């Protein structure tokens, strides 16, 4: 028989039991039942057999073995069993029950220990019996079904037993010895399932109404399923939000919005086009404006100035390209030097191997050493040959490039160079002609625009000024037409000179062939008839003199034509420059502009050319004292009127 005083002593010290339950909740160990609080010994098999006989249970025959071990586990417990994704598996330990994680294997039957509460006692089932069965766990299950309760069990007793598993939110008790318990968290259900199979006895009574075998199982509840669905939807929203943030982070940035065209925005864009750092952004805006069709007669001048600013960056880009090409050439040179050094070291290594294979040193090596040296030598020679072929290929390419750049001294090549120079000058004049034609079209457009404005406005002072501008533009247009005709005549003259040079070349070649045949004939005559060498030398001298005289005449004619053509070209360029500068320009300004077109021209040459044409250019003095400055102006239109 179990001593009743022992249970009374357990009931009288709830503080010690509470401390034991709190210590068991930390998951670091287990606290067995304090044997000092019971009169019966935990290790006494006779006392356990007597107590189990009183309950109508078959006593466990484990003589001499401790029934409740210091470290006991939850049999067959899986922390991740039927639990939702995202919930961290926890240690299935019930506070106050003295339970710890299981070390023994599943094949060994684990003995549960007796659980004492204030109002009842829980006895474990026979460890030889199979564990109680459970149904499939519903998703988000927080509610358990508890059956086999004693008839006299109250909600307070049930709460006292199951509140050790966790916070209880609701208990629904039925009159048929079962109830439903809803916990605050899902992992608490696993702790409650552990109590399935325990026999519950109220107090120390042996009445059937005060005892019953507990059956704890999962229960379906709409509230649990609804909360589980809410959590799933919340996780899905979080996942979608996370994916959206990731897509936004990986998506390339959208291009900046392009503002609409206005005169103010056009002025700002013109300033940006002149800045190298903002050029790429500004050129995109300019392209979009032109594609949208913002160009009309009123905005044509602004767009022309912006296109001109864009064209001014071509020289900068070419300079950058030249810089990169220079860097590439330097890198090629460094690579070639490094390759030469590597090839030199390969030659030295191969020389070492060749010296090692000579009879004087080869006899002292073993067979294995000779084999290794032979393999190394062959490998080094293959690498040396490959490097040498690569270096020779680089040198071959450089020689081909140099041969393309070299100039031959033959007379036919000189004539070809002269022809190419004339063709280049003709092409330059053609480009200048096209440029003047485009300027003429621009002036015509301006004249038409002024005519339209004149028809729309009344005859006022502003109209009078516009009439003057119109007359001035007409005069300018006439002057440009005259310049265009003059340049066309020069172009035709150059074409005729080019044809004449070709004819002279063919004539010179024919003359050379004839003289060569005559020379050959004279040599034959000398050999056959025995003429003296002096006659042959005289013939050669006469031939060379004729050829040289012909060459000198051709070069004099060509140099005189080139000189007059250059002066005409300079006059046309200076006239165009001074025409767009109605207030005149000093000689330094003119020289800086012409220096960009011809780097060999000097300021003195320009000034002498201007002084030779007093009807086209005149010199004026502006300013007083230290600000006194000489300016050259275009007076060709005034000179035409006076003549």
Curated annotation (Swiss-Prot):
* Cofactors: Cu cation
Q: What's a BP term from Gene Ontology annotated to this protein?
A: ultradian rhythm
Domain RRM, which positions? 142-221
Coiled coil regions, renumbered to chain: 307-342, 425-521
Q: Which GO terms describe its cellular component?
A: external side of plasma membrane; extracellular region
EC code(s) of this entry? 1.-.-.-
Q: In its keyword annotation, does this UniProt entry include NADP?
A: no
Location(s), subcellular: Cell membrane; Secreted, Extracellular space
The record ties this protein, via Pfam families, to: ENOX1, RRM_1
Documented activity regulation: Not inhibited by the antitumor sulfonylurea LY181984, the vabilloid capsaicin, and retinoids.
List, in alphabetical order, the Gene Ontology terms for molecular function in this entry: NADH dehydrogenase activity; protein disulfide isomerase activity; RNA binding
Q: Which domain of life is it from?
A: Eukaryota
- Keyword terms, alphabetized: Biological rhythms, Cell membrane, Coiled coil, Copper, Electron transport, Membrane, NAD, Oxidoreductase, Secreted, Transport
EC category: oxidoreductase
The similarity comment for this entry is: Belongs to the ENOX family.
What's its job?
Answer: Probably acts as a terminal oxidase of plasma electron transport from cytosolic NAD(P)H via hydroquinones to acceptors at the cell surface. Hydroquinone oxidase activity alternates with a protein disulfide-thiol interchange/oxidoreductase activity which may control physical membrane displacements associated with vesicle budding or cell enlargement. The activities oscillate with a period length of 24 minutes and play a role in control of the ultradian cellular biological clock.
Protein name per UniProt = Ecto-NOX disulfide-thiol exchanger 1
